[in-house]
Amino acid sequence: MKDEQLYYFEKSPVFKAMMHFSLPMMIGTLLSVIYGILNIYFIGFLEDSHMISAISLTLPVFAILMGLGNLFGVGAGTYISRLLGAKDYSKSKFVSSFSIYGGIALGLIVILVALPFSDQIAAILGARGETLALTSNYLKVMFLSAPFVILFFILEQFARAIGAPMISMIGMLASVGLNIILDPILIFGFDLNVVGAALGTAISNVAAALFFIIYFMKNSDVVSVNIKLAKPNKEMLSEIFKIGIPAFLMSILMGFTGLVLNLFLAHYGNFAIASYGISFRLVQFPELIIMGLCEGVVPLIAYNFMSNKGRMKDVIKAVIMSIGVIFVVCMIAVFTIGHHMVGLFTTDQAIVEMATFILKVTMTSLLLNGIGFLFTGMLQATGQGRGATIMAILQGVVIIPVLFIMNALFGLTGVIWSLLIAESLCALAAMLIVYLLRDRLTVDTSELIEG
């Protein structure tokens, strides 16, 4: 490993190390929002609602591909960080090689299994009439690019795992930048419409994946792309998938939860959907910053879990303090100028009032959300597969029974408060799980290596 990477893992002031790992991730999570709206933004110029719907309907498929990337990216990435903390550099090469080619294999399976059934999958997603063919065409490009999309998510995680978060951010920036350039060229210049939007995203992912591969080949002695090293054993598979599977489940279940929430809101009409949509966009930014903060320090926690428990605890304390500061600043803003913030999106006073109310409720849950993110990251970083699995399932499904109960009792107001109640339950569960696993979080390095 490079001396600079070791410095931030082992010696730099805790806050400096936290920002080194987290700031690029914060920027990256915000970029993901841009990524999500780019295609719709450019397609919007064509003023064809069917095309916009087609792109929107494919989001669950993208979530699945991201989840498959997390299966190896998060699972192997946290394992690699722990191996580096234990100074076991040679084993990390085998782990990375297996994960890279395992991800490519998953992508090829997606092509073989999903591509022939693009029309049927589009129909399952809800595409009808003119939207069906458009959605199917978009999916075909998405499926064909699956190996590179999955590989992109894996390699981005690996860059952070070895202490190179800036490389991770550069890769994401390059991908978004290329997509911004390609979308108008392919959509308008070549008159490819929806297919052009899909190709822009696909080519951007291919380019970013190649960027990461070239970087690792030239600069890393702990991540290998040598297929000869892709030799898994029982221990490797266990360490990767006990964290990778929960990360995969979280990606899938969170998308499902969003779908269920939309169904409840739709019952109250466009007024409710529009109000929630505005508040969601406002809460999304601090939420993504906190998510980036918590996910960014996962490699730092994983590394020091194996080498310096005291530093690991200091990192966790610094993150909690930072979450608290972000929360206080956001609450002050919402309760003083929240009405004006919402007013930037609409002049409809009924929507402004409801969206402001929703904003206050959802922003109140920001602290609890942050605790859930942090403790889930801790469980992933320290290899606590069972705890991570429980948290992944809870974060994905606990809101569903809460929604049914609160909707039956209090209507739309109950649906809104369900968000805070669900976050509270998940945060309490996370704290309980961490407390119950406290002995494992302080186990000696020698015991971990031998086990």
Curated annotation (Swiss-Prot):
Alphabetical UniProt keywords: Antibiotic resistance, Cell membrane, Membrane, Transmembrane, Transmembrane helix, Transport
Localisation: Cell membrane
GO molecular function, one term: antiporter activity
Top-level division of the source organism's lineage: Bacteria
Gene Ontology biological process: response to antibiotic
One GO cellular component term noted in the UniProt record for this chain: plasma membrane
CDD domains linked to this entry: MATE_MepA_like (cd13143)
Main location: membrane
Membrane-protein topology: Multi-pass membrane protein
Short name of one Pfam family: MatE
Residues annotated as signal peptide: none
Segments crossing the lipid bilayer: 26-46, 54-74, 97-117, 139-159, 170-190, 194-214, 245-265, 282-302, 318-338, 355-375, 397-417, 418-438
InterPro entries, sorted: MATE_fam (IPR002528), MATE_MepA-like (IPR045070), MATE_MepA_subfamily (IPR051327), MdtK-like (IPR048279)
NCBIfam families from the UniProt entry: matE, MATE_multi_MepA
Similarity section: Belongs to the multi antimicrobial extrusion (MATE) (TC 2.A.66.1) family. MepA subfamily.
Role summary: Multidrug resistance efflux protein.
Matches recorded under PANTHER family: MULTIDRUG EXPORT PROTEIN MEPA, SPORULATION PROTEIN YKVU
UniProt name for this protein: Multidrug export protein MepA
Organism (species): Staphylococcus aureus (strain MRSA252)
Gene giving rise to this polypeptide: mepA
